[in-house]
Design a protein with these regions (language model features):
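Extended catalytic cores of very large enzyme megasubunits
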Residues: 1-173
């Protein structure tokens, strides 16, 4: 690999290994990818594919290369490069947030025939005693956002409790 390829591999695809206090090598990144899919498919061509990827003769889904392991096992959305949604229901907003937090791009439409399906926005909003507790996870953020949008559409402004969030600058889990 040339310097540019090494930089991209290390900065975009290599996972940090806590025990070793370093990022994966290119070979370790490819091994993580191949091992992940080998456990999913019994006839997966592990050795042949590993050799092809390591030598840059074969390129897998780079999103899957980036997320193979716990993240991709937890949610297959992390393996997609892009997605699409019509903004025609309030649920679309938290779905977009969740998909983006999984690292997948989201295209969307706000064409008139779609957005007219959204509820009317109230003319006035009123503060309430309702508190939304934001949990420190992708689903926690998306759920909280869904609650917020729902309350705003009903004319209510809730309080937000962000005390469960990790400190600014802390590593993502």
């Amino acid at each position: 690999m040339n310097d540019y390829q090494q930089y991209i591999a290390k900065s975009r695809y290599a996972r940090y290994i806590d025990d070793l206090q370093r990022r994966e090598t290119w070979e370790e990144t490819v091994k993580r990818y191949v091992d992940f899919f080998s456990t999913k498919y019994s006839n997966f061509p592990s050795i042949e594919l590993y050799n092809g990827i390591v030598t840059l003769n074969v390129m897998p889904s780079m999103r899957a290369l980036m997320t193979a392991g716990v993240a991709l096992d937890r949610d297959n959305v992390a393996g997609f490069n892009c997605s699409y949604v019509s903004i025609d229901d309030p649920r679309a907003f938290d779905e977009v947030l969740y998909i983006l937090m999984c690292g997948t791009g989201v295209g969307f439409t706000v064409e008139r025939q779609e957005v007219v399906k959204l509820p009317a926005v109230p003319e006035e909003l009123f503060e309430t005693e309702t508190t939304i507790c934001v949990r420190d996870s992708k689903i926690g953020w998306a759920t909280s956002f869904r609650e917020l949008i729902s309350l705003l559409y009903s004319g209510r402004i809730p309080k937000l409790d962000t005390s469960k969030l990790r400190p600014a600058g802390a590593r993502l889990k």
